[in-house]
């Protein structure tokens, strides 16, 4: 969102916290900081060291080369929006396109991996105790299933786009929760009209709001938590567009301590509700003094992924946090400044790089997993045709791209040990825990084990080993899965140029003990 433009138009004093409140804020660099992991240490493979005095002979039995082809693995991808805070595509809003056609065209784009919905609370619930999902939901879910894509979403409690005519909250909740005027509508009110009134925010700390928020999350989780189509869910945050700020306007909270306590409670509730699908927490700095720093810490310790809704105009603190997040957490990036992807209107710098490409390639600097493409499918296709380098670079490097770059067979303990060096040619660590399976074609041998969370990190490798049953000779298929949430595993395709089996595994041949290619002391 262009919150800094709103700040310029607001010309309002923010709520200033007390010196005592600021003194309690835990400030630290994220680089080198130990947040802890919420993944239990289960069935860890031996990860070395694998020294020369451990074995009675060895040989390299598999080595692979990295592929730059796009992969549709969980935990990474380009996000195509079927709905954003202003609605669907501009053509749908103007009556020139049907909603069905918009969703189908977005889902049909070959470079889109995930379909994303960002809607208001009123778009998912009309009365207490039940979900009333707007048509965009079924259309998006059906298109994702049809085209082999996934779905992510955010439900907003606050949205400037339709104010003052329409607020984000459903009517039944607006009647129960005190609503606070925080200042005259700026440039992002209804149709850009700045003469129609004030921005209105709910009292997020009110018991009716908190109760309804918990109920909504329970209902959404009952429907979507663990659904294989759902990639991630944005934490329901406070503030404009659910980003955790009020863009320079005063906070609707009575004081900073109430805001901090309320937001921390909201985050803990959502972490407790969503067990199988990753949550994503906005890393918005605490410009509105609402306890964002503490809430982000709670979310990260609870295993939530991180996200930012802009990339170039962010403060230094947010860039440092995103780049140095725990490596087992994914990062989601977007920027709404040039969201229409109108290629002919883009400025090009002296190096011949257009503005949007400059923006999106910073995703790689942040070792991120996702980049958002917004709603304009026809413009996206035209942009990619005119400037193909940006999307191509992201799809070749963004997120994690793992493969067994070496596999050694060693004589050890009277049997064969397989040591796999799993390399990651992506920029990000594995968003969760990587599990490896060594399996014989008949299934009689089925060995599994995991690496440490996040390993192999971006542009790094990690070793792990299996001990095979005595006397086994022949084919072993090596397979990968990602534990994306505790006890939730999803298959991962190896990012190598060598051919894979139909199940995504890679075959290797275990040699007999009398094979002439054993090495020792050489």
Regions found by a protein language model. Name each.
Residues 396-522:
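Extracellular/luminal regions of secreted and cell-surface proteins that mediate adhesion/ECM remodeling
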Residues 121-131, 197-211, 252-257:
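The substrate-binding groove and active-site-proximal loops of carbohydrate-active enzymes
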Residues 140-145, 198-232, 262, 266:
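An active-site-proximal structural segment forming one wall of the substrate-binding cleft
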Residues 34-101, 111-113, 145-149, 231-243, ...:
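Catalytic-core regions of glycoside hydrolase
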Residues 5-23:
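N-terminal export signals
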Residues 26-114, 135-139, 143, 225, ...:
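Non-catalytic accessory regions flanking glycosidase/transglycosidase catalytic cores in CAZymes
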Residues 159-219:
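Active-site-adjacent "subsite" loops/lids of carbohydrate-active enzymes
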Residues 109, 117-183:
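Aromatic-lined substrate-binding rim segments of carbohydrate-active enzymes
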